[in-house]
Amino acid sequence: MKYYLYVIELDKSVGKFPKFRSKNPNFLFGSSCFYVGQSAKIPLLRFKQHKEGYKSNSYVKRFGIRLIPEFYEKYNPI
């Protein structure tokens, strides 16, 4: 079975949330933030699923902006 790596840019405002900061103690407020995942689904479909709430990471659902294909295209499919 093929798997795909994907990288999603998160809005920088995610850093305002205490729960996020507690899970990411080295996060510097105002810096770029990314979510990295893998799936049997192609990245665009998986991003849409995150945004719709299907098996979604709560930060991606709320703060996901866009896929960053230049970070993962060269590795796919795994």
Where are the regions a protein language model picked out?
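GIY-YIG nuclease catalytic motif and its immediate N-terminal context
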Residues: 1-48
